[in-house]
């Protein structure tokens, strides 16, 4: 198309790859659910996102499948967000502040192929 400034589609997966390429050694710092501070680089994050995408593919996940997440903001959820999107699947994030009944309804309605959660949500 004429008039477009970009030469490729703007995809979520390209964001982490751009960061890994142009800011490889910059740190991502977050506090894990368990308490300690977690530090690693954009390069390491991109590698882990690709590994997650490959693992989900080997488990039979296909483009368009829905992958559910119930997690607090942290490095693991970041990796899920970018890893799932990079393989063409849908990252279905759930709000941890919803009631148990609401979460059950939403999970069943979405028909998530896989579901990831932080241990703080496991009874």
Where are these regions (language model features)?
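A detector for short, charged/polar N-terminal pre-domain segments
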Residues: 1-6
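A short N-terminal helical cap/helix-turn-helix that marks the beginning
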Residues: 7-29, 47
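Conserved phosphate-coordination/catalytic loops
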Residues: 10, 43-47, 97, 116-119
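Structured loop/turn residues at beta-strand edges in well-structured enzyme cores
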Residues: 10, 21, 62, 108-110
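Secondary-structure junction/capping motif
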Residues: 10-14, 41, 123
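Structural core segment of the AMP-binding/adenylate-forming
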Residues: 15-17, 58-59, 86-123
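Conserved AMP-binding/adenylate-forming core of the ANL superfamily
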Residues: 28-82, 99-104, 108
